[in-house]
Amino acid sequence: MKLKDTGLTFQDIKDKVNKYMIETYERFDFLAETADGMYIYDENGTPYLDFYAGIAVNSAGNCNPKVVAAVKDQVEDIMHTFNVSVQ
């Protein structure tokens, strides 16, 4: 979902994050709206090199087409389970 589709401003989102999330590190002052490969893009399309890539991004890149396809395939069958069942 894009920021423009929420009816919220970037400041609204920042205020909610600051209210409900523990601040363990300083956050970037932009809204990460999309990502592709090694870049994150803000709501204006400005690219930022993703030096803080998360666990999966470290090896696959943001929105890697093979990973996206595999996730879509999996969530069509089951999206969440717990460790008392084998899937």
Where are the regions a protein language model picked out?
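Active-site-adjacent loop/helix segments that line or gate small-molecule/cofactor pockets in enzymes
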Residues: 1-36, 78
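Glycine-rich loop-to-alpha-helix module at the N-terminal edge of alpha/beta enzyme cores
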Residues: 47-87
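Active-site and channel-lining beta-strand-loop segments
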Residues: 30-50
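Aromatic side chains
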Residues: 20, 25, 41, 48-52, ...
